[in-house]
Amino acid sequence: LREIAYKFLRETTKDADELASLQAALVAKLDELEQTLGKYPGPYFVSSFSLVDIMYSLHLDRLAANLPVYRGYHIKGNPHFPRINAYFQALAQRRAYQRVKSDDTTNNLLLRRRWGAQPVGNLLPLDLATSEEIQNRAEAAERLSDNRQAAIEDILKNSGVQALARNGDISAITQAVDFHLSLLANYLLDGNSTPLPWGRVGGKDRVDPWEAAVGAIALAYVRNRICAPRDMSAGAATAFRAAVDRVLPCIY
């Protein structure tokens, strides 16, 4: 399954017949997996969660994230694979698994960055229910606060924001980045209880466009810079990205 799946994902040909053949081979392997999951009672490979699940679960999770974005093919929610979907649902209830898995965005960003795979669609929508869970928001805020200085240095070095430096002085940029990261952390903790500073373009309470531009670059960069589980759990990463999506348009 792994070999044919990644051949399908990384294939550079645009020949429709060849891609269809690879997809058919993948579906055949998934059908075999579907049958394997039916050999024992319960949703796992054997009668209870085991080493086999530990070996295969993360791999299957990556495939479920990558295939819709890079090949337009869905495993999750596909009625052709009821046992595989029951397997994913069972894994979602295991707290330890949720601590070590990647989120869908991390899986898709890594496939493109490491292997140069070319997507055929956009990133999968974030799970809004996961993003609103208080423990995920709190963890994301904590990880951001604990690593604030490292995040600022990374943004300054790699986001391109230094191009906005005035007379080569990056101190004002550093302050603006710090301000917007704090705004993000506060939103993660407080949610909608504290209004965001939106709608200031062209109004009396006018935002400094230079500072807003720095903040926009910083947040857009860090949204896709975080990696689960390296930086935080998958649930916290989802909450982090959703918070950026909410805060970013409120900068102006």
What are these regions (language model features)?
Residues 2-93, 132-252:
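GST-like fold's C-terminal all-alpha helical module
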Residues 64, 69-70, 97-128:
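Extended amphipathic alpha-helical segments with heptad-repeat/coiled-coil character used for oligomerization
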